[in-house]
Amino acid sequence: MLSGGSDGVIVLYDLENSSRQPYYTCKAVCSVGRNHPDVHKYSVETVQWYPHDTGMFTSSSFDKTLKVWDTNTLQTADVFSFEETVYSHHMSPVATKHCLVAVGTRGPKVQLCDLKSGSCSHILQVMFAGHRQEILAVSWSPRCEYVLATASADSRVKLWDVRRASGCLITVDQHNGKKSQAVESANTAHNGKVNGLCFTSDGLHLLTVGTDNRMRLWNSSNGENTLVNYGKVCNDSRKGLKFTVSYGCSAEFVFVPYGSTIAVYTIYSGEQITMLKGHYKSVDCCVFRSNFQELYSGSRDCNILAWVPSLSEPVPDDDETTTKSQLNPAFEDAWSSSDEEG
C-alpha cells in the first residue's frame, strides 16, 4: 500500500498479516523520506499505483508537481511541473489506448499529462476550460476510458470526453433542470464547493460530496440527480476529500470521512449503516481493497487503520442473561460498528 503524508514523505507498506492475529501492525517496507533528493517539498495529496504494473507509481503534491516513480529503485522516472498547487490526480483503471493522468489544480482548467511522451511535452495543450474556480477532485470512469469527471470549488461537476475538442459532455444539475437558468444555483451540483467524487464500481453512477454537507448520486450517462437522500454528511475539508465505494458486496456501500469517523451508507437507498470509530482526529481519506474486502483510512492523527467486515455484533451489556452474539442482517457482507475494530 502507498501512503503520502503532509510532510511530503511517501511510505510503502506490506499489508500481509503474517502474525495471523486479529489485531496487527503492517510493516513499512520502504519510504521516500525527508532526506531523499526527490522528496516532495510540501504535503502529498494523492498517491496511486500505475493500474497495470506495481513497478511504477505516481504522487502529486502542494509543491506543484506530479512525480512518476520507479518502485524498485524509488527514483523519479519523470516529473511534471505546474504553475498552480496540485489538489488531485488520477490514472484510468481501465485505459488501454492512452496513458493520460488527469490533474486538478488551483487553476480552473483540467490538465492532462501523457506518460507515454513524458515531461518533454510537459502538459498537453488540450486543457479543458469550463470551471470557474480550482478543481478539487478528478476521476476517470471505470466504464469508459475516455470519460473523466471533475469537481470544482465553483459548485459544479462536469463529465468530459477527452477525445472531443469541446470536451464537456455534461454539467450536472442538482435541480434536474427544473429551475430557471437565472437562478444562481442552476447547473450546480452542490450549494458549496464540490471537493470529492467517486464512480460506483460499474461506472453507471457518480457520487459527489460538497461543503454544503450533502452527498449526491448521479446517473453518469445523462447527469440526472437520482435524489437519494443520505442526510447530513459533515464535510468541512478545505481541500479534496477522498472517499470510496465497495466492490463485490451483496449490497454496495460508500465510505465517507465524517470528522474523526467514517460514515457507511448503502449507495442506492441512502441508509446510514454505521459509523466506524477508531481515529481521534479528522479522517482525510479512505480506500477499499476489494480482494480482501478491507477498508483503509488515513487520518490527521498520523494513523492508517484497517477495517474488516464482521458478520456479528456484540450483545448490549445490559442483557446479562444472554452471552451469544446476534447476527445483524444489515451486516451480512457488510461492516461492524464495533469501536474495538481497526
List each model region and its residues.
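Loop/turn segments within WD40 beta-propeller blades
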Residues: 48-54, 90-98, 139-146, 198-204, ...
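Signature of short aromatic-glycine-proline-rich micro-motifs recurring in repeat-based ectodomains
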Residues: 44, 194-196, 240-244
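Conserved strand-to-loop turn within each blade of WD40 beta-propeller repeats
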Residues: 4-7, 59-63, 103-107, 151-154, ...
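Terminal intrinsically disordered, low-complexity extensions flanking WD-repeat/beta-propeller proteins
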Residues: 225-242, 249-252, 258-264, 268-342
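Long, well-ordered mid-to-C-terminal structural blocks that present hydrophobic/aromatic surfaces
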Residues: 193-221
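Per-blade loop-tip surfaces of WD-repeat and WD-like beta-propellers in eukaryotic adaptors/scaffolds
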Residues: 12-41, 52-54, 65-100, 106-135, ...
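General structural concept
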Residues: 1-16
